[in-house]
Amino acid sequence: MNNGRIVRINGPLVVADNMKNAQMYEVVEVGEPRLIGEITRIEGDRAFIQVYEDTSGIKPNEPVYRTGAPLSIELGPGLIGKIFDGLQRPLDSIKELTKSPFIARGIKVPSVDRKTKWHFIPKVKKGDKIEGGDIIGIVNETPLVEHRILVPPYVHGTLKEIVAEGDYTVEDPIAVVDMNGDEVPIKLMQRWPVRIPRPFREKLEPTEPLLTGTRVLDTIFPIAKGGTAAIPGPFGSGKTVTLQSLAKWSAAKIVIYVGCGERGNEMTDELRQFPSLKDPWTGRPLLERTILVANTSNMPVAAREASIYVGITMAEYFRDQGYDTLLVADSTSRWAEALRDLGGRMEEMPAEEGFPSYLPSRLAEYYERAGRVKTVGKPERFGSVTVASAVSPPGGDFTEPVTSQTLRFVKVFWPLDVSLAQARHYPAINWLQGFSAYVDLVANWWNTNVDPKWREMRDMMVRTLIREDELRQIVRLVGPESLAEKDKLVLETARLIKEAFLKQNAYDDIDAFSSPQKQARVMRLIYLFNTHASRLVERGIPTKKIVDSMGQLLPEIIRSKAAIKNDELNKYDELERKLISVFENLEKEAGT
């Protein structure tokens, strides 16, 4: 395989000649430090290479070494709880090797530790017919995750050998498959190219909600397992905290958090918090189900693209094991900016705001890899990849290309409103601009498993919030006193919805996570208040009198979100009794 020669260097873009027979997206090693790069365009025998490391000090005429392979990552036991850079190099191994807090250029570190021995338990026997995706054994990687060892997708045949139960490294052959006369060894670890989606048998309709513990996300704009969501918002509106809450509390089996081009101190916060946090679903440390990819803003821009693909490929791998995985990316705007930067250096024709014309197709490729699927292989199993990505529009302008193109491909839109953030309403998700295409799909799950009136209560809350916005303009002009009594009740119910339900403190031990049952109990209180109060207003009782009769009950309902724990829901029975008692007294008065 002939090596190339550098002819031009422009930041992260390197042009090399003598690259005859090179392949698109082939990985190359650039210059004497052997920096990792990827071929993104070929013209004759010239190759345009985006380099994933700092190119300072590289000179023309230095060699470019070809590898003949696409950008691939290692998949196997040892991923969970690890912190990787954008090229899947473990940061702790780099620090041990370099004795420095900085990532040295051209450093080669295995992604999965070669020395650790894992206890392998075989699940198949010699002579079995196997195909790609079959589970041939398990490794208990952490107390939360049973790592299922899969046959690589394109391997099939008769199992010629399988090792006995015991301890093995990721490079030890654990099985041999007779594939059309060839002996193919299978190890605990496999490699997969990041740009190629992993195969599955069938894509399924997402019908089960991914519970996040955040009330506005679970109830007003729910996301299903296998769904796609975007969180756009200007600086300071709470994107990172919302995504961190998703990563911490969501009901996914595996969470992959990709910090793509965001500030280093935000990733540092993550790395400090995660080891001490407990998973609310199991009580175990959160790191036992989490993988972190740290690719901060001071790292080379080209590596942002790699980090997004590395994250989604790892998510697909755990999906194929039959797990529900969540990929959190913060933020895709930084990836799009990297595409714009590289497109400009490659002298491509720019589209809107300088972004490349292929931006929509790249975003589509990324979001299409989400979904709930029936996996290949035996035994039959189902898995999902849910994608939630932040978008950082400059100045909060949702019409800019990245946000507007993202909206074409996602089914859930959680827009953050800076005016809500300034009013200290968190999460600052605008309930008028947001949407979810999964409400109808997940309503049956909520009605069956949580509360049969869930859909009715949710729709009442949404209608009230929309009506309150319509009335706000009138209130600004002539004040609330000029409104009809039923409209005054709308304002009061909307205030209760916002204060008792939509507002949530991500830093409060009790309020940070609301179970589905707790959410339904709060909704039920609001629904009862609105239903009974509407009847009384129709009978001529003023809204003010109803609110005054409540005394401290409404503030008590508002405080309950941070006062009543998820396992103390019987306390809501007392609040319900008090509420109904007040309305019974008012009805007696109205009847006399």
Swiss-Prot record:
Component of the A-type ATP synthase that produces ATP from ADP in the presence of a proton gradient across the membrane. The A chain is the catalytic subunit. NCBIfam families: ATP_syn_A_arch, PRK04192.1. Its EC number is 7.1.2.2. Belongs to the ATPase alpha/beta chains family. It is an enzyme of class 7 (translocase). Gene3D superfamilies: 2.40.30.20, 2.40.50.100, Bovine Mitochondrial F1-atpase, Atp Synthase Beta Chain, Chain D, domain 3, P-loop containing nucleotide triphosphate hydrolases. Pfam families: ATP-synt_ab, ATP-synt_ab_N, ATP-synt_ab_Xtn, ATP-synt_VA_C. Has multiple subunits with at least A(3), B(3), C, D, E, F, H, I and proteolipid K(x). It is found in: Cell membrane. Its main location: membrane. One of its GO terms (molecular function) is ATP binding. Keywords: ATP synthesis, ATP-binding, Cell membrane, Hydrogen ion transport, Ion transport, Membrane, Nucleotide-binding, Translocase, Transport. This is A-type ATP synthase subunit A. The lineage of its organism: Archaea, Thermoproteota, Thermoprotei, Sulfolobales, Sulfolobaceae. GO terms for biological process: proton motive force-driven plasma membrane ATP synthesis.
